[in-house]
Amino acid sequence: MIAWALIFLAVAIAAGVLGFGGIIGAQAWIAQVLFILFLVFFLVSLLSGRKPPVT
């Protein structure tokens, strides 16, 4: 999933350089949504404070 987010991020950066339009604009929107989603998941994991299992 992270690989897809990075691919969409690269496409979004290219779209920003060339101008947002068509399918590139849609991919830029998807990249923004994925970024916010992963940021929320990261913050939730930080706040939950779970420790890794001890083996």
From Swiss-Prot:
Q: How does it sit in the membrane?
A: Multi-pass membrane protein
One Gene Ontology cellular component term attached to this UniProt record is: plasma membrane
Main localization of the protein described in the UniProt heading: membrane
Task: Note the superkingdom of the native organism.
Answer: Bacteria
Asked if the Swiss-Prot or TrEMBL record annotates the protein with the keyword Membrane, the reply is yes
Enumerate the UniProt keywords alphabetically: Cell membrane, Membrane, Transmembrane, Transmembrane helix
Q: Which residues cross the membrane?
A: 4-24, 28-48
Is Transmembrane helix included in the keywords of this UniProt record?
A: yes
* Location within or outside the cell: Cell membrane
- Family (UniProt): Belongs to the UPF0391 family.
Q: What is this protein called?
A: UPF0391 membrane protein Sfum_0248
Taxonomic lineage of the native organism: Bacteria, Pseudomonadati, Thermodesulfobacteriota, Syntrophobacteria, Syntrophobacterales
